[in-house]
């Protein structure tokens, strides 16, 4: 995590240094850049957490209805040295789970579909994986990375715009360059996200003593997502699968939530490049190695 933070800070530092160089040593501009970046990341973090929970209709997980899950999360949290996160349950339409928030104020959401298909040990592996994300501050790190990507893109736009003749051609060039730079930084952030998934898998394996339960859980989740995607395609072919609000993946989850979940359905080469998760088969192979 220290290396990841250092690299993200390097991107941010380069952006601020470039703004300082091109716009002059103006204390006001520098102050606005720093304050604006902090506010941007903070807003993204707060709004992102709220939207993720709201989009799946997450509700507090009743301890009387799910006593074992509460006990296991409390035990695993204690072993990982973190405060027990808030537990929520949701009807996602697919078997999955995700974590939001930071260490000391985290939330783990588990779909009812996941609870229905997993054995106790398999569910323990999933819970340990999500707790690892909270313990390692992965969600906060990814939000920070996305915020820095936006800042770097904005700085690149203004550099192109103000270093030219400030005409219409420069305006469109600035947009293209800014989006391209932001995309390139985002690719790096996504690579970090895929790496952190492997780390969370390894932490979960250590927490429960074996990687086999989580490997089986990932297989079942992958199968469940594929079945849901197939049903969605069938509904679409019959004309009943028109998208309502926002852009959604074939599994029916908002893309923002899908990025947080333990498993992602991305399969094509391009999807793998811009995916937040590594291929499920590789994760299973590592867990069983």
Swiss-Prot record:
Q: Which superkingdom is the protein from?
A: Archaea
Transmembrane as UniProt keyword: yes
Which enzyme class? hydrolase
| Residue ranges crossing the lipid bilayer per the database entry | 3-23, 28-48, 144-164, 172-192
Entry binding sites for Zn(2+):
129, 133, 197
This protein's cofactor list reads:
Zn(2+)
Keyword match Protein transport: no
Q: Matching Gene3D superfamilies, A to Z?
A: Metalloproteases ('zincins'), catalytic domain (3.30.2010.10)
State a single Gene Ontology molecular function: zinc ion binding
Q: How is the cofactor bound?
A: Binds 1 zinc ion per subunit.
Matching InterPro entries: HtpX_protease, Pept_M48_protease_HtpX, Peptidase_M48
GO biological process terms, alphabetically, are:
proteolysis
Q: How does it sit in the membrane?
A: Multi-pass membrane protein
HAMAP family hit by this protein? Pept_M48_protease_HtpX
Indicate what this protein is called per its UniProt record.
Protease HtpX homolog
Taxonomically, what lineage is the organism? Archaea, Methanobacteriati, Methanobacteriota, Stenosarchaea group, Halobacteria
